Amino acid sequence: MRCWGTPAGMERDVKPKKRSPRIVAISWGRMEVEGLGVGKDFKLFPGGGRAWDWTETGTRHFPGIQPADVEELLAHEAVTVVLSQGMDQRLQVPPGTRHYLEQRFVTVHVAETRQAMRIYNDLAEETLVAGLFHSTC
């Protein structure tokens, strides 16, 4: 797992006003999300979420998650973002995407999908967290 944080002195009050939905279960090609049901890939954010359709922004495993993929997460006031790389960690997160989030003082976690789920669910209890989750390779 990799994590990039908010610079010292730039912390914000992150008590959740609206909770991010918990991930109930995850396995290869299948996720179950509280209040959203079952799907393959999800965008989750404070107050809700939806299926993550890679074709909307032209996402592919390489070059990976782009700033356009995370814009919606920030629109929902996320101060922490969890990016899953898939079960086999084939989904890349280029430096430009991390930089895009860091410039906006967003804490970023990048991890394999099952680990990303644990990080996200823990954070959902205490902060305005969002995430992109890919449940296959």
Question: What label would you give each PLM region?
Answer:
Residues 2-57:
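N-terminal, charge-rich interaction modules
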Residues 51-74:
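Compact, glycine-rich, soluble single-domain proteins
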Residues 52-53, 89-93, 119:
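Short active-site-adjacent helix-start/loop capping segments
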Residues 73-109:
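Mid-chain, well-packed structural core segment of small domains
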Residues 118-124:
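Glycine-rich, charge-decorated loop segments at or immediately adjacent to ligand/cofactor-binding or catalytic sites
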Residues 125-137:
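A polyampholytic, Gly/Pro-enriched intrinsically disordered region
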